[in-house]
Amino acid sequence: MEEDWGKTVSEKVISAYMSLPKKGKPQGREVTVLSAFLVSSPSQDPKVIALGTGTKCVSGSLLSPRGDIVNDSHAEVVARRALIRFFYSEIQRMQLTSGKSNEAKRQRIDSETSSILESADSSCPGEVKYKLKSGCLLHLYISQLPCGYASTSSPLYALKKIPSTQVDDSLLVQASDICSSRHSDVPEIGSNSNKGNGSQVADMVQRKPGRGETTLSVSCSDKIARWNVLGVQGALLYQVLQPVYISTITVGQSLHSPDNFSLADHLRRSLYERILPLSDELLTSFRLNKPLFFVAPVPPSEFQHSETAQATLTCGYSLCWNYSGLHEVILGTTGRKQGTSAKGALYPSTQSSICKQRLLELFLKETHGHKRESSKSKKSYRELKNKATEYYLMSKIFKGKYPFNNWLRKPLNCEDFLIN
């Protein structure tokens, strides 16, 4: 059953990827990472609804205060932002189909696919209107282990490569259970005790790897662990959509995996057991989500990375796609659409549909319709995110708890922008 599920999910995702045009895909010896979200129900097999590729991030010095670039173009993050746009499309679908005067619009909507969302109970807090439809499950696929604590460079993985005759069992216990200890004097990423891309406390939050200048993006392992507490929908959507959690996580097998290595156990330790210290501090709307972990077959060659980063030639582009019509190619090191010239870099036409500014526009359209706000009443991206009070407090608790209490924070001005 487990092998069948991993194979089914990977085949669905790879088929969706192969159906896309060549633009933005690896060329020659280049490789990339592929990630996707799928949805299933008792009456529907898994279907890909959002997809992303990529391995690049914007360096710290190139971060924008306008919210007009994609800071992190790793596959998992791109897929999740494409998923958020899909949620907005589904919300719009529900609004159109609920309006009796919109018969013509209803007929133009793709009738073969029902919405994955439904109306939330009236007892839900605040203005929450929607939730994941009863019986629907969300699934995540990644072609390889996510970067950070779950990656092949983690001490936990490295110990598994030592022959069992040469390693004491206590070392494995120590490596896998590091996160159960409660250190208080841990170094901040980027602090004097931990500069640049140097060694980092193994089980704590890690910076995304970068060649050359340091990035300010947190690893995918840490972000997925956070989704297992706060949901994948983010702070803005939380104001209208109940937390959405991942039911299964499927990861492609590697040609370089050590013998007797349990990928599913490794993922459980990395993405679930690290959040257990938060079990007594959860707020009402949230839970410790425990996905089921599955192994998929080795992916096609364009997703097979060498054992060492130095030997791997990675594609600089990220594909971004979702079922509601989104399809873009992003240059990962600039966070803008492929083909953007230096002269036109600030034009709105260069912005990706998944940058903060574009997602904020969707949120304002959902919550305010087409009403124009006066300049005095306008709120910044940060202020609007913080209106999700319970989400904001839960996020603060999460980032204050070991092993996440050295969560990297970007400059405050990166979220102070307004929408004109």
UniProtKB/Swiss-Prot annotation:
Q: Which PROSITE patterns match?
A: A_DEAMIN_EDITASE (PS50141)
Needed cofactors: 1D-myo-inositol hexakisphosphate; Zn(2+)
Q: Which residues bind Zn(2+)?
A: 74, 147, 220
Q: Where is the secretion signal located? A: none
EC number(s) given by UniProt: 3.5.4.34
Biological process GO annotation list?
tRNA modification
What is annotated about its quaternary structure and interactions? Homodimer.
Which gene is this protein's source? Answer: TAD1
What is the name of this protein? Answer: tRNA-specific adenosine deaminase TAD1
Q: Which organism is it from?
A: Arabidopsis thaliana
- Give tissue specificity per the record: Highly expressed in siliques. Expressed at low levels in roots, rosette leaves, cauline leaves, stems and flowers.
The record's catalysed reaction(s) read: adenosine(37) in tRNA(Ala) + H2O + H(+) = inosine(37) in tRNA(Ala) + NH4(+)
Provide the residue positions that the database annotates as binding 1D-myo-inositol hexakisphosphate: 80-81, 223, 226, 385
Lineage at the top is: Eukaryota, Viridiplantae, Streptophyta, Embryophyta, Tracheophyta
CC per GO annotation: nucleus
Instruction: Name the enzyme group at the top EC level.
Output: hydrolase
**Phenotype on disruption:** No visible phenotype under normal growth conditions, but mutant plants exhibit reduced growth rate under cold or heat stresses.
Keywords, A to Z, come to: Hydrolase, Metal-binding, Nucleus, tRNA processing, Zinc
